[in-house]
């Protein structure tokens, strides 16, 4: 734990110098900073090749920002041409949906493909660009570009039978929202389409009310809540012109989930990820598309859970020059890379240790290196870039300094990379580095020449020991400007709080609003608990069957630490978050109400029985299997402990965390005569923008000034 004495605090906050000016409230409110206070970093556009990269920037003596090509060996900038920006992939082809109809474009020639009333979704070219596959009315179709023929591949699509179009819980929790419900996959040889068929008829329907118009309307979604029936899923194979579907050898009646499947590079088989409903036994099968037979290729079991969602197939990386693949797994308590033969046999671990591999950026089979991004090897609050041999030897850090390297852009063959890096006290910089870790060129510094003339609030990363003494928990603290040791300040804690979803990084994050709050005398804290990912899967496992408990133990310990040190006013301790962060905020003013006095909760889960099956049961098992866990994690269980001031906010059409959660909390508070603040955003989903987004920001600002700062809001701050 990093201990801070009154003497050190006095020294720390007096070291800024008497000659520095203070940014005015008006400058911060309007975000109109002095000249040369901040510089815009170059914007990475793309690599042209190993020696040339396009950056959007201003190159002296020109002050106009435009696209430049940096010739790395020559060290010279030239303005990028249209051809360089456009790329080298003529003739350009695209398939897109406009007004629900499918259009195909080659060069400048556009053609409408579909004309019926059914809305087309997710057009995808075959790898040989001869076909476009898409769904409409919950059936799968193809369009043959050369002949203009449309082929219908499935014929049983209904409101509850979906072919090639994912059921809601798969889209939200397994495949990811970026997939846009797509549930079909071309084989590499363009001869087969694998797809999933979802039967939702047994899944409970959840109604969402739309208040627009004279009579309003209902939007109904098949939404499986914890312990409820899931959709039945089949995996099938069909040719691009139709014919009988070959079904994979799985029993659709089993209580199971399927992950994002991955074709082998030769199209000979499809790797299908299967997991039981309890989500503690992952099996990967090689499925033959010609007859549907399956062969177990990989199996992983954990006492808590195995993550099925993997960024749309990111668990596997097949090699080109040998019959092997790289698999990512957190089975040891940390996410690492493993080299397997194509039959699934483990050859060797590639990485190991108390850190987590986040992404593979390049597999260089010729040079014999794997380039990857990892978190936690240097510090749990930093990410860095590394390379390692296939046998796990010669692990080399390529990034540098005590910085968080937040954006890595590697050249196509891995000779160079561009990194954007900073820490809590150092503004962001952009640097060009080679694959030996040597800095080649500084590309930009966001710190302007005038920044040092101004007194800024100090932000630092500290560690707070957990109450059980097992963890050094990270907190990013922005202290009040002109901090006075011994004076107690109100404190605002911002967090998300979900499993393996930490928000604390040792990085620079300029915010005019944060500087204004610091001038007003507010301690601002971002804090991550033991299960936020800083301590690997081993730390996240604490949440198993017990959501809310360990998170709140750590949040309360953090708040008590500031109170005990005489820095925080125990009567003004506020916590705020959205979604899972909203849940924690509500839990803080019930279970944790002896420590927290105020909370702003948005889009909150209140009772985990009201959230979806896949996410909830991964951590909690079903309500039938874990009744005590669901009871203790329920905000309503602790409602009689409620005290303080709670602001509850929800979008009326939230299809993820239903407004039902907030309404049940409100009902319980009203039944007990408890006071609270409440705001609805009509039509709002799980988040909202536009004028309602501005209103939401103003709402939170008013809360901070009224309840924490207890002063008038500066003119112009509320828009």
Where are the language model's segments positioned?
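Serine-hydrolase catalytic core recognition
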Residues: 205, 260, 406-719
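Non-catalytic accessory segments flanking enzyme active sites
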Residues: 41-46, 51-61, 67, 77-81, ...
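Beta-propeller domains
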Residues: 196-347
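Short loop/turn segments that connect beta-strands within beta-propeller blades
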Residues: 72-73, 106-109, 145-148, 239-243, ...
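Predominantly five- to eight-bladed beta-propeller fold
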Residues: 25, 31, 73-80, 153-185, ...
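Asp-box/WD-like beta-propeller blade repeats and closely related beta-sheet repeat scaffolds
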Residues: 99-141, 147-183
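Short glycine-/Asp-/Thr-/Trp-enriched loop segments that recur within the blades
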Residues: 34-40, 87, 120, 160-179, ...
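Beta-strand C-termini and the immediately following turn/loop, strongest in propeller blades
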Residues: 49, 54-61, 91-106, 132-139, ...
